[in-house]
Amino acid sequence: MTIRSPEPEVKIAVERDPVKTSFEKWAQPGHFSRTLAKGPSTTTWIWNLHADAHDFDSHTNDLEEISRKVFSAHFGQLAIIFIWLSGMYFHGARFSNHEAWLSDPTHVKPSAQVVWPIVGQEILNGDVGGGFQGIQITSGFFQIWRASGITSELQLYSTAIGGLIFAALMLFAGWFHYHKAAPKLTWFQDVESMLNHHLAGLLGLGSLSWAGHQVHVSLPINQLLDAGVDAKEIPLPHEFILNRDLMTQLYPSFAKGLTPFFTLNWSEYSDFSTFRGGLNPVTGGLWLTDTVHHHLAIAVLFLIAGHMYRTNWGIGHSLKEILEAHKGPFTGEGHKGLYEIFTTSWHAQLALNLAMLGSLTIVVAHHMYSMPPYPYLATDYGTQLSLFTHHMWIGGFLVVGAAAHAAIFMVRDYDPTTQYNNLLDRVLRHRDAIVSHLNWACIFLGFHSFGLYIHNDTMSALGRPQDMFSDTAIQLQPIFAQWVQNTHAVAPFSTAPNAAASTSLTWGGIDLVAVGGKVALLPIPLGTADFLVHHIHAFTIHVTVLILLKGVLFARSSRLIPDKANLGFRFPCDGPGRGGTCQVSAWDHVFLGLFWMYNAISVVIFHFSWKMQSDVWGSVSDQKIVTHITGGNFAQSSITINGWLRDFLWAQASQVIQSHGSSLSAYGLPFLGAHFVWAFSLMFLFSGRGYWQELIESIVWAHNKLKVAPAIQPRALSIVQGRAVGVAHYLLGGIATTWAFFLARIIAVG
């Protein structure tokens, strides 16, 4: 990879008109590659085109040009996101029962999709309440709109148009910053400036402006909605912003203006910026005054953080200095050399960001149900289940992506001559110890966690319930988890004396929040059943990590193939004549890691779905008696494999299997179709390239006989392509099957 010489003293961060705008190039598929630009001679061409179109490393060696392409592509990505968001808001304005839901969120179900009456498809439009027929949606948009103070279709239309304007701006920026004013490499490598702007601008000012919107628009509108005022009677957002008297009626401290702020009497503002904890009993969501406080605090933190790094003024932190000073007594050169890695390898940078973002997304999944941030989210069980499942899947994919790009970095960008005795080098040198120990941990966890279930199934089959691991026989209580729960539950009276309630009702206590006769949230008990399944979680996560980490650590070389780096990121085998060297490429480890990621996430979402239906979700009578959806059967049924199959998969699949002829057949058909897609994947995964090439050649012979031979020669998929198609359909089929199963079930019973 060529890295250009340093620029002269005067900083000119952009280059003018570096690449001319050419419609001819756009019209020529594969213009970025001499081989692909020639056009197809065999069917392999279309696969290579898709594989390489966005692999900018394969277009050029120039790091500056690669950086510009990535930068420009990001604007394209943002444009797509804005168009998607705009579409969501437009549907909410044009095809939804949003205003009916807003007036009665406990009885009306959200819908923003109406099926046209073609071949009888209108059966899919169920009665969602409020005199509306449509498909029930579980995306949570209605709840977000309620929280942000949107009360009318006009506001949704306006936001949708705004989204399209932003999308156009992004598309323009993507073109402008590649063709007209392209940043120089030094600009992409100026990490201190980037940190300052992203921390202070995106996160700091972003949070501050959201906090401002919440205070001046969301809070007053939500307070009036909570009090039962009709949405059409509520003043418009600009009236709250411009008319202080209007705000003073709801929040008296507004009469004092900014005086308390400058005199440091901040407690005066506690009518709209609170620290209450717990949930609003009217909506079942977090107190919006708490979330205002949260965003204000985040803004302060990040505005400070965005002024910590040294740029033109010679004060503040230098990242290179921080990294190079970061060494302990046993860690050799420590982080020396990492600065150069992260400023010259975007794969390394991306790997780090994906690992962080993936972990964060999974953290979000767990907070969405335990601290539901939007009004009426907690009692919309379909949305709760969808949001948890969605964020778990996304997090899983991002973490696997982190390993993929870490391995690409190792193969393409890692220079062993510059990395001596730093942490990366030391990790690579003792990789055998890491991988073999991790392998031992996986075997231990696998045998012991699964063994507990096998024991229970055997005892159950032999009619010996007294010898099973369960809450009523041999107890295996998760005492550490229970201790953590209890510590948080008692915090308001001990370690957090100013809080009115603990951070989440799930920790414990006696509180129960019910909205409209449905449980929003209550303390979640943990027992032997949770102890067992948590060890399955530990097992599947560790195996996923083992596969992915082995792929990264052995991406460049191994005892089996010392020169692996020369073979690239993805290759089928180490050439003919070397048996037993297939499926060792870094790409193959990502491929295998995806299957275990799928295993891991499946167990998590199954656990969540059943646990919530059994122990949390349900109806509440006037006498405060809770009736859970599956009547608390998780603790006794989920302790055997048979119980998972019988009382979860089979029992809860009845809704999707029996959905035909009703509006839920919107899930019944995809349930069948997704099973087919999943089964179809096995055809790619369980057969070799040679089989297909032989078959293709006899089919081509038949075409030749009939004088209808194609000009482009058919070729079987390469080994790697076949596995890619296989895993894509496996995951798509598996995820879509789970989606149909979950939603048909929860919409029917929730």
Swiss-Prot record:
Self-association and partners: The PsaA/B heterodimer binds the P700 chlorophyll special pair and subsequent electron acceptors. PSI consists of a core antenna complex that captures photons, and an electron transfer chain that converts photonic excitation into a charge separation. The eukaryotic PSI reaction center is composed of at least 11 subunits.
Assigned keywords, A-Z: 4Fe-4S, Chlorophyll, Chloroplast, Chromophore, Electron transport, Iron, Iron-sulfur, Magnesium, Membrane, Metal-binding, Oxidoreductase, Photosynthesis, Photosystem I, Plastid, Thylakoid, Transmembrane, Transmembrane helix, Transport
Organism: Huperzia lucidula (Shining clubmoss)
GO terms (BP aspect): photosynthesis
InterPro entries: PSI_PsaA (IPR006243), PSI_PsaA/B (IPR001280), PSI_PsaA/B_CS (IPR020586), PSI_PsaA/B_sf (IPR036408)
Cofactor note: P700 is a chlorophyll a/chlorophyll a' dimer, A0 is one or more chlorophyll a, A1 is one or both phylloquinones and FX is a shared 4Fe-4S iron-sulfur center.
Membrane topology: Multi-pass membrane protein
Residues involved in chlorophyll a' binding: 675
UniProt name for this protein: Photosystem I P700 chlorophyll a apoprotein A1
Major subcellular site: plastid
Lineage, top ranks: Eukaryota, Viridiplantae, Streptophyta, Embryophyta, Tracheophyta
EC number: 1.97.1.12
Binding-site residues for phylloquinone, renumbered to this chain: 692
Catalytic activity reported: reduced [plastocyanin] + hnu + oxidized [2Fe-2S]-[ferredoxin] = oxidized [plastocyanin] + reduced [2Fe-2S]-[ferredoxin]
